[in-house]
């Protein structure tokens, strides 16, 4: 495999080209990209966990250091002022010397407020991208050039097309997440609580709870019906029925986002339903290709959901077409089939149809779908179908003309299992789709 250093060199060349184009289009001289700052908890003296500006970590794999600055103009070597204070209260990261530092000019910044004297004197035509607009104003950046929408839309659109460096980082993140999922399944099988399963996951991935790209969803039994369940019970339930784990990892700022669901027993209806959702998810991925709208795959999976609802006699006496047409599949899969993935878990530009930021909303019938793009080579997306038994979504169907088609007895029997979600991360290539998750043999 090509070294990360050579992949990074090409990555920087791509970012430089995008920057030149953006600066020319919006008549700017350079971009000043801020890693961010620490923000204290209200009325307290300690900060919230630091989360770096995604536009900053697109350039350099520096994810834990606030008060850093990048100056890029698309021509000259990117200039990084790296925050390096004299501080005996807190850990101070050393000046970087890694695979990427040959391609970036790295300069120590001893004082957070010292950046002003180091920037070019003429700043009226520099754009600021970062989370602290007031800092940009203090530096003399024009208000109209602070997080300029056109520039950000342009950069976001092209972030959809991953460089080979980015794909290499995402494959490494996959490896970490797969290790975590295997450790978590083992913890579940041994009867651990959600809290302890989460600890097992973090240990296996080498992450702290604040390092994972999103809060781990560690859901036993009926908790799997809460789509973003993050409570983490300390006590294991008396009876283990099911386990849904939606948890990722991060490598050089790039995310993995995987979900698996396990049944405690292998010989019940729920276990068969888990197997069937998994099979249908793989079957859908096998049909994916460049040039097709992501929306089409979402709609196709509702047809697959209908097939499973019929097979398992959860919905009866109704054709699969009628189920989808009348949205009887909706309460069972209330979220989208997935989303773009990259520097952010819900990566940017899912609705953007061009580099001017033209927005195409999700279909009215499926408002929670996070992507309406035509799939193109270089895109990375999640494919994460599910079937859930959520009373608040099922309740409206208990009355009315369609109620008789719901096998309420079967639904009540499945509700204690919560739900099912299976999620892989896929790369769209010119002539094939790469399933980064299954390539690592995660069942």
Swiss-Prot record:
Q: Which InterPro entries match?
A: Creatin/AminoP/Spt16_N, Creatinase/aminopeptidase-like, PepQ_N, Pept_M24, Peptidase_M24B_aminopep-P_CS, X-Pro_dipept-like, X_Pro_dipept
Q: Which Pfam families match?
A: PepQ_N, Peptidase_M24
Record keyword Acyltransferase present: no
A single Gene Ontology MF term assigned here is: aminopeptidase activity
Q: Which family does it belong to?
A: Belongs to the peptidase M24B family. Bacterial-type prolidase subfamily.
What job does this protein perform? Splits dipeptides with a prolyl residue in the C-terminal position.
Concerning NCBIfam families, the annotation shows: PRK13607.1
This one is known as Xaa-Pro dipeptidase
Source organism (scientific name): Escherichia coli O1:K1 / APEC
Underlying gene: pepQ
């Amino acid at each position: 495999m090509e070294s990360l250093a050579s992949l990074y060199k090409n990555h920087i060349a791509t970012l430089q080209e995008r920057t030149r184009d953006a600066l020319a289009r919006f008549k700017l001289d350079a971009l000043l990209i801020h890693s961010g700052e620490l923000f204290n908890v209200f009325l307290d003296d300690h900060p919230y966990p630091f989360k770096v500006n995604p536009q900053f970590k697109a350039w350099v794999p520096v994810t834990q250091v606030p008060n850093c600055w990048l100056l890029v103009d698309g021509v000259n070597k990117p200039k990084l002022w790296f925050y390096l204070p004299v501080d005996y209260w807190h850990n101070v990261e050393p000046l970087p010397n890694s695979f990427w530092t040959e391609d970036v000019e790295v300069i120590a910044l001893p004082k957070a407020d010292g950046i002003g004297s180091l920037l070019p004197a003429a700043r009226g035509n520099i754009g600021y991208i970062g989370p602290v607009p007031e800092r940009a104003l203090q530096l003399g950046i024009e208000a109209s050039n602070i997080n300029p929408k056109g520039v950000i839309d342009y950069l976001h659109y092209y972030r959809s097309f991953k460089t080979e460096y980015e794909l290499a980082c995402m494959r490494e993140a996959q490896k970490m997440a797969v290790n975590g999922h295997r450790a978590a399944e083992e913890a579940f099988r041994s009867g651990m609580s959600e809290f302890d399963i989460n600890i097992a996951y973090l240990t296996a991935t080498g992450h702290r709870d604040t390092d994972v790209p999103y809060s781990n969803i560690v859901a036993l039994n009926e908790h799997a019906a809460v789509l973003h369940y993050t409570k983490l019970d300390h006590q294991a339930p008396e009876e283990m029925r099911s386990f849904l784990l939606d948890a990722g990892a991060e490598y050089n700022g790039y995310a993995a986002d995987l979900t698996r669901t396990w049944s405690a027993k292998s010989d019940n209806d729920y276990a068969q339903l888990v197997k069937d959702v998994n099979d249908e998810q793989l079957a859908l991925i096998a049909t994916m290709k460049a040039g097709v709208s992501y929306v089409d795959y979402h709609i196709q999976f509702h047809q697959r959901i209908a097939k499973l609802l019929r097979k398992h006699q959860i919905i009866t006496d109704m054709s699969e077409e009628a189920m989808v047409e009348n949205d009887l599949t909706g309460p069972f899969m209330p979220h989208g089939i997935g989303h773009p993935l990259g520097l952010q878990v819900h990566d940017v530009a899912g609705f953007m149809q061009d580099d001017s930021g033209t927005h195409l909303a999700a279909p009215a019938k499926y408002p929670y779908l996070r992507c309406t793009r035509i799939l193109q080579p270089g895109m990375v997306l999640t494919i994460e179908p599910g079937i859930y038994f959520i009373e608040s979504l099922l309740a409206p169907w208990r009355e009315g003309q369609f109620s008789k088609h719901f096998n309420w007895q079967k639904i009540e029997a499945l509700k204690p299992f919560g739900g099912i979600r299976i999620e892989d991360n896929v790369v769209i290539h010119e002539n094939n789709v790469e399933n980064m998750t299954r390539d690592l043999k995660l069942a």
